[in-house]
Amino acid sequence: MRILKKILIGSRNLLLLLFVSSLLAVVAYKFIPVYYTPLMFIRVYEQVRDSKPIKLEHKWMPLKQIAQPLAQAVVASEDNLFLDHDGFDMIQIQKARADAEKGKRVRGASTISQQTAKNVFLWPGRTYLRKGIEAYFTVLIEWIWGKERIMEVYLNSIEMGDGIYGAEAVAQAHFKKPAYKLT
């Protein structure tokens, strides 16, 4: 019984530590730019592993320095209900589930909020564990950050090509101009 009690206390303490540290990280990123994400480190590792040159282009820009049409285009193409939901588009989730049950190709139903949670706090992958943790972080960022901050972090952390992350890096790499000049 002593060992079981120690295991239970240790498990409780670990869960409490994970909960508190996740809250602290989300609160910190409400105010601090997200300069690097787990995905960036994973991609650099893959480049090294595959003996490719390391490419990591990323420059944080405040939302007001990113062209409004870019944000509008992202919402239109990725999550047209972004301003109307609390992080989850239940209709798209149900459609994706129905398609999967019919044996159709699995399609994404992740919102901008879910993608931001994944990009900033997690790793790429398609496991139920990662999706569960993603849902937890999605609730936290919706609650603590709000839509404007979620959009700002999304536009600065999204992978937009091989080694290119965020609106400013893609604007420079593909259009040779700053993100605020995109139309």
Language-model features: locations:
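Juxtamembrane regions of bacterial inner-membrane/periplasmic proteins
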Residues: 2-182
